[in-house]
Amino acid sequence: MEARVLWLLVVVLVLGSSSLAVAYQGLATNLCEVPPKDRVDCGYPEITSEQCVNRGCCFDSSIHGVPWCFKPLQDTECRF
């Protein structure tokens, strides 16, 4: 019985550590430099910055009256 518990613990630790290695990288800062009047809403009222970023959006709560969670600029650079 102890061997099963030990193997289960090993499997859980391996799977847990591998999921940590694939962390969200976020957007380049320049992609979030959207003028306030051009922001396209990407969230919902009371969305947190973490929830917004996890959706692939930008978050800036410093300007009132415009969306805080908004779509980033389109990356026009080609990547190979």
Curated annotation (Swiss-Prot):
GO terms for cellular component: extracellular space; secretory granule. GO terms for molecular function: identical protein binding. One of its GO terms (biological process) is regulation of glucose metabolic process. Residues 1-23 form the signal peptide. InterPro entries: P_trefoil_chordata (IPR017994), P_trefoil_CS (IPR017957), P_trefoil_dom (IPR000519), P_trefoil_dom_sf (IPR044913). It comes from the Eukaryota. Its main location: secreted. Pfam families: Trefoil (PF00088). It is found in: Secreted, Extracellular space, Extracellular matrix; Cytoplasm. Disulfide bonds join C32-C58, C42-C57, C52-C69. Residues 30-73 form the P-type domain. Keywords: Cytoplasm, Disulfide bond, Extracellular matrix, Secreted, Signal. Monomer. Homodimer; disulfide-linked. Involved in the maintenance and repair of the intestinal mucosa. Promotes the mobility of epithelial cells in healing processes (motogen). PANTHER family: INTESTINAL TREFOIL FACTOR-RELATED (PTHR13826), TREFOIL FACTOR 3 (PTHR13826:SF16). This is Trefoil factor 3. The lineage of its organism: Eukaryota, Metazoa, Chordata, Craniata, Vertebrata.
